[in-house]
Amino acid sequence: QGSPNYGEGPVPEAMWISEVTFYCQAGFRHLLMSGVYERFPKLKYILTESGCGWVGDMLKQLDRIDIGFKHGSIGEMNYQRMQWVLKDKPSEYAARNCWYGASFPSKADLNGIDEIGEDRVLWGNDYPHYEGTFPYNLESLRLTFAGMSETRRRKLLGLNAAALYKFDLAKLAPLAAKHGPTPAHVNGPLPRDEIPG
């Protein structure tokens, strides 16, 4: 992802975690704006560990830039010699070619899901990293997914990944039945006194 080396100072992990999404977003922007998906229309790009709450706003920004270039309204900048390579809007390439692996997303992170499409988001728990949700995966799921429709929840928690990676759901069914969780496990809200401290 191109993150810098933060060295041995007192807070390198804090610096890294505060900027990690920036570097993920940079690659995402570069691929969308450079015409990669125009040249490789079957390419699938999956961002992981960067959430998805920011995607809708970024796609709106990139679409505005695209329109500006196509209609010559970028302001005082002169781009007449530049050949614009995008036939479609950046948001249209994202809708066809991009997915978002949201590691232990919060409810706020999923607020913009309708803008990017519920079929584009994949849940993750970031195991075995210490900042992930293990061993409190079920509690995390309840905090985020309680009250969400079962159809949407099933898509985010597994069906989207199964479709993207072409998993054989019939072969995976025994494992899912053994290891869960079931809809009943995650549908109820998590009371404050059950939140791990």
Q: Where are these predicted regions, by residue range?
A:
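Histidine/acidic residue-rich metal-binding segments in metalloenzymes
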Residues: 1-93, 107-119
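Short, flexible loop segments at the rims of nucleotide/cofactor-binding pockets, characterized by
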Residues: 22-25, 98-102
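Residue-level detector of alpha-helix boundaries and kinks
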Residues: 14-17, 21, 97, 126, ...
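Mid-to-C-terminal alpha-helical segments outside catalytic/metal-binding sites
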Residues: 34-35, 43, 53-54, 74, ...
